[in-house]
Structures are given as structure tokens and as C-alpha cells.
């Protein structure tokens, strides 16, 4: 069963409540409905503070998908399976190719700048770990998170362990993420073999199908990590998944790379589409809930929230109703069969 996050009138996250309790508070006028990037929550109208318990976030990093669990001693509030950010490396390669091509035209607008080396994290690595930090900050606005526990992944080889620790993008990005998390809440880590031992002790299985949208793919490890800190359960009490995928928005691209008829490149990219911020969730009378994509000739394109498939390209901006800003797609999977949930718990 999913609990409803509760936020006080001053914006402080409180302990989540039962859906029936949330409906009662809304009916009596003590709370208002709100929606934040795929998650429903309530905001109290009169209460500005409250007593909270320890809530832990477990994170299982991955190369393609990642698991995140929000859990207290009494309940498992949320399981998130997030798609990793994987498009930045190819985007930077295309950017470098475009810059290189501009250097060899008749009018070289882009001069070589070999002495402008960029320090810090590689863009693709930073985007991966920033994505985890964005999700964590989002959860901190809705849940009273007191601690974060992460499975400590390593990129060390037998030949050059010192080189890997100091220069490997994975190791450097991981340490950057750990430093940022410690600025927010306390952090604890477990090795991969320790996570497996705890999972085997509880009798939990992990599937080999890493791309499957099931609890046993990644969230089983994030749940085990959170349960190791806060305790309370011998078996998962909530295995329902909220699948999250980041939107790939071409913010700084002004036109298509390949010229069209007559050598003219059509406009492409940007952050806004006829007054709408790209990725914003809207309601259409025919297609229902969708999000805004690109724009062309006074029309905007709408995309399906579940899988990002384009629904249409000729929607008038006046035909849609703006609902919320969003930078990712979120879909709540149905309750798994045979997990002991009652029908009234999923309404």
C-alpha cells in the first residue's frame, strides 16, 4: 500500500499518512491536494510543525537503471526505479564534432582553444550523479529524511588501484556525490558483498533481468540497504514501483545539424515551446495527461507520459491546460499479483 506524503503549512515534510486519512483531511478542509513530478501529496492548511520519525533512503546505483527506497521502521513508503542518464556522452561527442567542423570553414568563427581545458568531473559522469542528487532533493521536500545509505560501487583494477581511485570518472563522481549528500543528511555506505549477504539472510532473490520493471531488479537492494539502517521488517511490505525517466531536452541547440532544402536549417531545441516550458505536464481534451515537447508553426507536440511516445504535433496552446512543471516522466506500476494487497488499498 502506498502512503500519502504530508507537508506542513510552512513547507516542512511530516510523516506520511494513510490514504483514507488524507481524504478525510481534504474533506474537512484541513489539507489541500498537491502534485509534484508524478507524486501526489497533501499540504496541511493550519499545522506548521509536527513530530517525525527516522526515515531512511536506500540507493542502489546502476549503469542503466537504479533503485531508490524510502523507508521507516514501520512502513516502506516508496520504491523508485529510475533510468540512468546515458545520453550526455553522445551529446558531447556531437558537440565536439560540430565545433571542429566550424573551425575549417571559410569564415572560422570557432578558433581552436587548446589551452581551455576543463577541470572537474566529465560532463557525462556529473550528469549521472547529479540525477541521483536531484531525486534525493525531490524526496527531501516530501519526506522527513534523516539518513541516506548507498551501495558503495568501486572501479578498481588489480593493476593500478591508485590510478582508479584518483582519476577514474566513476570514483571521482562517486566521491563528489558523497560530499554533496553529507551536506544534506548523514550518509552510510555498504559494500556490494555486504548487500548480497543481507539479501540472502532475508531470503530475497534478485533477478538477472536488470532492465525489467520489477521490484527484484534493483529496488530489492535499495530496500535491503534501508532496512539494514532503520530495521522493522523481515520481508518487504511494499513492492510497488514508481518508474522515473529523465527527459532529454535539447536546451542549447538552436537548429538541426543537417541543412534542409535550400541549405536552410530548421529551428530545433530550446527550453520553451510557445509559452510552455518543455516537459511540463498538461491536460488535453483528447489525449488526457501528457507533457509538452517541441513546437513548430504555432503548434506544440504532446508526448505520452508512460513511454514518451509522441501523440501529436499540431496542438494549439489554447487547447491544453497547464498542470505542473516536470523534468522527468513518472509512471506508477500496478500492484503485483499475489503480493497480498487488498483491493481497497490501491484505490
Where are the predicted features?
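Gly/Thr-rich phosphate-binding beta-strand-loop-beta motif of the actin/hexokinase/Hsp70
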Residues: 53-72
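Short beta-strand-centered aromatic/proline hotspots
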Residues: 280-281, 287-303
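Short acidic-glycine loop/turn motifs at beta-strand connectors
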Residues: 8-10, 71-75, 285-287, 296-297
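Charged, flexible boundary elements
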Residues: 17-51
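Substrate-contacting helices/loops that form the catalytic groove of nucleic-acid
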Residues: 72-278, 322-347
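SH3/SH3-like beta-barrel fold
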Residues: 68-70, 300-306
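Low-complexity, highly charged intrinsically disordered N-terminal segments
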Residues: 1-18
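A short macromolecule-binding patch
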Residues: 78, 303-321
